[in-house]
Amino acid sequence: MKMRRLLGASAALVLAISSTVASAEGKAVTIGYVDGWSDSVATTNVAAEVIKQKLGYDVKLQAVATGIMWQGVATGKLDAMLSAWLPVTHGEYWAKNKDLVVDYGPNFKDAKIGLIVPEYVKAKTIDDLKTDESFKGRIVGIDAGSGVMLKTDQAIKDYGLSNYTLKASSGAGMIAELTRAEKKNESIAVTGWVPHWMFAKWKLRFLDDPKGVYGAAETVNSIGSKELATKAPEVAKFLKNFQWASKDEIGEVMLAIQDGAKPEVAAKDWVTKHPERVADWTK
């Protein structure tokens, strides 16, 4: 998930969604997602595949901005979304729309942001960076102004890392730096989050954050419109049951997409390979 500062949707964009998201007739649902978030793409496509295969619904996926996704579900123009980071990241959206939507619970637990390192480095906590010269006084970040970058600026101050520089980059740039470091077995600290496909590719861990700068773990929740339970009761029941078991499980799908598979193909392959998980979700 690209942890960008969340922006409110404009009235014009809200009107735009009404023209692109039509109310489907019969057994059909429309689900919103954020195209730039790898976890949103993976989770939404897997859910859509299960809903189509096992519940017999047509599913339309609508890529929208975060604010429009929330407003779309709140107004019933979208039937559901599976990308609500709670209670903090999307806290303002929840506060504004909680009486207009239904929370079907988490589809991923222990979502979090922070500083990530390869398992082979010696540092265990952010505080350890102060005396560990192997990192060469550098933390590799993503987009300047994103939530995790703002928190990292704060962490540098709170932990007294005056000898460190936070390098703004992009998601792709951060991954490129991590790839190079992994190949050379070098120390590197990057800004990141789970769920993310990089945890399926490499052995990584978060540096402990005893000061709590990055906050506690969150959950990624499935949110439905008020009308969903009446319109599509089987889908509503599925959303209550749908939950990833671990970051490695969703990581399989995200990594397949990162390696070039189309999201719908990666989702279909995963559903085919894991019938027992699908059975748990649809019982």
Regions found by a protein language model. Give the residues of each.
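Gram-negative bacterial Sec-dependent N-terminal signal peptides
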Residues: 1-23
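Immediate post-signal peptide segment of exported/extracytoplasmic ligand-binding proteins
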Residues: 22-31, 130-136, 276-283
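Extracytoplasmic "Venus flytrap"
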Residues: 26-45, 66
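Short helix-initiation/N-cap motifs at beta->coil->alpha
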Residues: 37-38, 60-72, 166-177
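A conserved helix-loop-strand patch within extracytoplasmic ligand-binding domains
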Residues: 98-145
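A bilobed periplasmic-binding-protein/Venus flytrap-type ligand-binding module shared by bacterial periplasmic
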Residues: 112-122, 218-232
